[in-house]
Structure formats: structure tokens, C-alpha cells
Amino acid sequence: LTTPRHYAYVKIAEGCDRHCAYCAIPIITGKHVSRPKAEILQEVRDMVAEGVKEFQIIAQELTYYGIDLDGKHHITDLISDMADIPGVKWIRLHYAYPNQFPMDLLDVMREKENVCSYLDIALQHISDHMLTRMRRHVSKQETIELIKQFRERVPGIHIRTTLMVGFPGETDEDFAELMELSLIHISEPTR
């Protein structure tokens, strides 16, 4: 299968500094390295000229964009500037991390029509016991509050996530806690 002409992936960074217990990405790809903003924006302009309308923004850790450059989050400015490029119809954000999520990114999502109310964020688990074992550096309460903020600040947001079961040390109680989260906090009932 090929990617349709109107659709493109834009990689904004390579690597990851997180070192979660189950993940080999930092070993394989190395430390997080952000691409220069001007280079990314020019790539998007060039793709628009070729007929691309929908952009999937990807990185192993999207929300960390820019931290390696000067210690500050720059994902919000990047996405805002990208949304202002004539011809960009849709922008979707993939592979965010819950720890230190830049909340102003939600404002851009809400305010810019072409930034979809869609976020792919890897939660992995909800049990504090499992989050610690996985070295996720976020708690159950922080995760629940984050999801609540997503829903309050961007009504109708679509959250895509991955949840990991069977990680070594997971108990029946941990699993039950995870199922409760997925039913109550992530899923919205359909009618």
C-alpha cells in the first residue's frame, strides 16, 4: 500500500531521552534531536506545492520538540506556524508523551481550524505501581488530570493511545485499574 498523494508524514525529530523500561528506541535511535524549524516549515511548503493537504506530525516524542535546542518546548510555535501555511488543510499530532505535556498546544489545537482535535499520546498504563515499573515518570492522578484538561480545553478531542498489558509484575489489581481507566476516562460513550 502507498500513502495517498494528499497525505504526508513530517518527522520533526529523531530519538528519545525517556528510557522507559520496555523500550529500545533510545538505544536504537539515540538521544532526541529536533530538526530545525525553518527546515520543517519549508518541507511542508514544498509538499503543499505538490498537492499534499493533510500532515501527520511525527516523532518518537513529539512534545519534546525543541528541548534539546534551548531547554524550552517549541512544539506549540512549530504547529501554529505550520497551520498558518496556505494550503495546509489538516494537521494531526502523533506520539506525544504525558509527562510535562505543553498545555498551550491544546490552545493551538482549539484555535486553529486546520489543527485536528486529535492527539496520539502513549499512556501505556494507569496503575502507579506499573507506571513506576515502566519508568514512565507520571502518576495515575497526573494522567487522569491530563485527560480531563484535554477534554475541557478541546471539546470533542479524539484521543488515541496505546495501553500495555502483561508487563512483568502486573497484578490482577493493576489490570483492573487499567480497564477502569479505559472505560471511564478515555472512552466516550457512543449513542
Residue ranges and their predicted role:
Residues 16, 20-23, 40, 47, ...:
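Hydrophobic packing within well-folded, soluble alpha/beta domains
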Residues 163-164, 175-183:
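A glycine- and small/hydrophobic-rich beta-loop-beta segment
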Residues 5-38:
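Canonical Radical SAM [4Fe-4S] cluster-binding loop centered on the CxxxCxxC motif
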Residues 49-172:
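Conserved SAM/AdoMet-binding glycine-rich loop
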Residues 1-3:
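P-loop NTPase nucleotide-binding/switch module
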Residues 29-56:
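Conserved alpha-helical substructure of the radical SAM core
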Residues 182-191:
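Residue-level detector of conserved catalytic or cofactor/ligand-binding positions
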